[in-house]
């Protein structure tokens, strides 16, 4: 089983977005914050080219893969082999720039987003970085609800935080927790600090923001 840190503390914690401050001395009610920021959080719909390993897993029984490994011959298929994947993103400008995770759009042949009002827009990839797991998308349009990127240096361990995503094109999902640690580095990586949180992250929330 993957550790809680890797499974829940890394995916949506890449981004910290400044919002209203809460009083940690009293029970935290995030309802107003959710209402304020959720329109800027969108669902990302991706059509991806399948890798050789994914084709192997899909078409060859596990027992054969275990014994023969890469020596298994995959039957040739007509046309490109693709799959559909989902994630989340959020607007950082009114003119259509969004931030998500690199692993959400990696190997994508087509990217679209679903807005809070159910409109679907085609998105183009502006750029992405595998090491930091950050990607920037662009959609045509104007007057999108935007979020302001916060200052991670002002974030404190133990501070209440809220994770929001828009998985699978459904209504947004929200979960609350605290900042468990700052400046975490993934194993084998250097100079890529992450925020660790115990907020539960649902499937499809990758790329969504974390609010303080």
Language-model-derived ranges and their functions:
Residues 1-11:
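Bacterial N-terminal signal peptides that target proteins for export
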Residues 24-212:
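Serine-dependent protease modules
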Residues 19-22:
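N-terminal signal peptide c-region/cleavage motif recognized by signal peptidases
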């Amino acid at each position: 089983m993957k550790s809680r840190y890797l499974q829940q503390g890394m995916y949506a914690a890449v981004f910290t977005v400044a919002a209203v401050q809460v009083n940690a001395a009293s029970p935290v009610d995030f309802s107003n914050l959710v209402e304020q920021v959720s329109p800027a959080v969108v669902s990302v719909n991706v059509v991806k080219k399948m890798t050789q390993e994914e084709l192997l897993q899909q078409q060859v029984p596990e027992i054969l893969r275990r014994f023969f490994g890469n020596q298994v011959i995959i039957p040739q298929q007509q046309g490109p082999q693709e799959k559909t994947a989902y994630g989340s993103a959020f607007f950082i400008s009114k003119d259509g720039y969004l931030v998500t995770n690199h692993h959400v759009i990696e190997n994508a042949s087509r990217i679209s987003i679903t807005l809070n009002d159910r409109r679907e827009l085609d998105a183009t990839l502006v750029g992405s970085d595998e090491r930091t797991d950050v990607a920037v998308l662009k959609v045509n349009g104007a007057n999108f609800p935007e979020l302001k990127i916060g200052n991670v240096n002002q974030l404190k361990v133990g501070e209440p935080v809220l994770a929001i995503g828009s998985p699978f094109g459904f209504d947004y999902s929200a979960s609350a927790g605290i900042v468990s640690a700052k400046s975490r580095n993934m194993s084998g990586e250097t100079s890529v600090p992450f925020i660790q949180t115990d907020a539960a992250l649902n499937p499809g929330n990758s790329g969504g923001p974390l609010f303080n």
